[in-house]
């Protein structure tokens, strides 16, 4: 199976400017994902999709390829990463280069391990379905309230039904670390999700970290200082 790994790294982060090249444990943030992808030995090609020459140079330095810089229309705040992935697939196809599947690795999950990537790929190969990483979430609907039009705190009936559901079924959240789907599925449905989609359960809090704000960054550095986690 020929797998294309795509690491999206847009330059224009507003909540944490310059995060993709900011140093974490002595390496740019994006480098940790590139190294993990390389060490997984799962991918035919590892491509960083970016609109930034600086990010591109860092990506190449750590072993990824940047065959094209991302166009402006795919690098806005409202751009969906799926359109970037489809654009890459079409560009490779124009060069007579074809991939069976695409593995999406967000650079904001620096604790993601190579073996976790291999596990996701194995599930995908065995089932033929899309695989998306998720984490357990502790949701207590009994603690949830909304505010009505008069400004009063109320407990909607919806939350009561949700409480019954949560008591009987574990709830998981998407953590953004790993997505994998066939190229055919992505192009036809413009989505990484298939019917059904298989979960990759990440019980590790650190592997589920998604750095998006200065607080996220500070917590990540604190984890490292406490020697509770090691980066690749």
Curated annotation (Swiss-Prot):
Its EC number is 2.7.7.82. It comes from the Bacteria. Transmembrane segments: none annotated. Keywords: Nucleotidyltransferase, Transferase. It catalyses: N,N-diacetyllegionaminate + CTP = CMP-N,N-diacetyllegionaminate + diphosphate. CDD domains: CMP-NeuAc_Synthase. GO terms for biological process: lipopolysaccharide biosynthetic process. It is an enzyme of class 2 (transferase). GO terms for molecular function: N-acylneuraminate cytidylyltransferase activity; nucleotidyltransferase activity. SUPFAM superfamilies: Nucleotide-diphospho-sugar transferases (SSF53448). The keyword Lipid metabolism does not apply. InterPro entries: CMP-NeuNAc_synthase (IPR050793), Cytidylyl_trans (IPR003329), Nucleotide-diphossugar_trans (IPR029044). The keyword Flavoprotein does not apply. Involved in biosynthesis of legionaminic acid (5,7-diamino-3,5,7,9-tetradeoxy-D-glycero-D-galacto-non-2-ulosonic acid)(Leg), a sialic acid-like derivative that is incorporated into virulence-associated cell surface glycoconjugates such as lipopolysaccharide (LPS) which could be a key determinant in the ability of L.pneumophila to inhibit the fusion of phagosomes with lysosomes. LPS contains a majority alpha2,4-linked homomer of legionaminic acid. Catalyzes the conversion of N,N'-diacetyllegionaminic acid (Leg5Ac7Ac) and CTP into CMP-N,N'-diacetyllegionaminic acid (CMP-Leg5Ac7Ac). Belongs to the CMP-NeuNAc synthase family. PANTHER family: HAD SUPERFAMILY MEMBERS CMAS AND KDSC, N-ACYLNEURAMINATE CYTIDYLYLTRANSFERASE-RELATED. This is CMP-N,N'-diacetyllegionaminic acid synthase. It comes from Legionella pneumophila subsp. pneumophila (strain Philadelphia 1 / ATCC 33152 / DSM 7513).
């Amino acid at each position: 199976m020929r797998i294309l790994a795509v690491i999206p790294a847009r330059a224009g982060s507003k909540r944490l400017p310059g995060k993709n090249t900011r140093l974490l444990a002595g390496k740019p943030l994006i480098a940790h994902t590139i190294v993990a992808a390389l060490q997984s030995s799962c991918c035919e090609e590892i491509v960083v999709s970016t609109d930034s020459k600086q990010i591109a140079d860092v990506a190449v330095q750590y072993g990824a390829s940047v065959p094209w810089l991302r166009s402006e229309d795919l690098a806005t705040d409202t751009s969906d990463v799926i359109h970037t992935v489809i654009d890459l697939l079409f560009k490779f196809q124009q060069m007579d280069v074809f991939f069976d599947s695409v593995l999406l690795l967000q650079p904001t999950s620096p604790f993601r391990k190579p073996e976790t990537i291999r596990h996701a790929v194995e599930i995908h190969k065995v089932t033929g379905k899309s695989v998306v990483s998720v984490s357990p979430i502790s949701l207590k609907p009994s603690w949830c309230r909304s505010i009505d039009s008069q400004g009063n705190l109320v407990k909607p009936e919806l939350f009561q039904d949700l409480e019954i559901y949560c008591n009987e079924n574990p709830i998981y959240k998407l953590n953004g670390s790993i997505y994998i789907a066939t190229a055919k599925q992505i192009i036809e449905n413009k989505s990484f999700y298939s019917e059904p989609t298989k979960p990759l359960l990440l019980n590790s809090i650190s592997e589920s970290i998604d750095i998006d704000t200065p607080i996220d960054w500070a917590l990540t550095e604190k984890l490292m200082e406490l020697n509770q986690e090691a980066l690749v």
